[in-house]
Amino acid sequence: MRTEVAKKETVNHQWFVVDAENVVLGRLATQVANVLRGKHKPMYTPSVDTGDFVVIVNAEKIALTGNKMADKVYYSHSGFPGGIKSSTAAAMLSKKPEELIRKAVKGMLPKNKLARHMLKKLKVYSGGAHPHEAQQPAQLSL
């Protein structure tokens, strides 16, 4: 008996939709990262993108536990001297809630070339509507 290894041409990518309303950010991000990697499938192969597409709606209604809204700080740097910028989770949630979820999921993906392909399969929307109804996404229970 031989071990079956997934190939890029034979992988079937499904679409899932997740409602992020009143869901804790870290718990959502871990499960979404596993679906993006394909670890929920029996044909999971670390070197092949076996993951599925994930659409997250209601990103502005995500929950953070404890004092993370005020205490959690996100940093970015322009590359120039003195070019560091910081924003709290509360400020990021009010301005760009999609980016808050995207950064959380990105931190839980592997740090390699394949992670960029996996992150492209993540679609995050702040409202309840999304333009991916044609793909007939299935509801992903958390």
Curated annotation (Swiss-Prot):
GO terms for cellular component: cytosolic large ribosomal subunit. GO terms for molecular function: mRNA binding; structural constituent of ribosome. GO terms for biological process: negative regulation of translation; translation. InterPro entries: Ribosomal_uL13, Ribosomal_uL13_bac-type, Ribosomal_uL13_sf. CDD domains: Ribosomal_L13. Keywords: Ribonucleoprotein, Ribosomal protein. It comes from the Bacteria. NCBIfam families: rplM_bact. PANTHER family: LARGE RIBOSOMAL SUBUNIT PROTEIN UL13M, RIBOSOMAL PROTEIN L13. This protein is one of the early assembly proteins of the 50S ribosomal subunit, although it is not seen to bind rRNA by itself. It is important during the early stages of 50S assembly. Belongs to the universal ribosomal protein uL13 family. Part of the 50S ribosomal subunit. This is Large ribosomal subunit protein uL13. It comes from Trichlorobacter lovleyi (strain ATCC BAA-1151 / DSM 17278 / SZ) (Geobacter lovleyi). The gene is rplM.
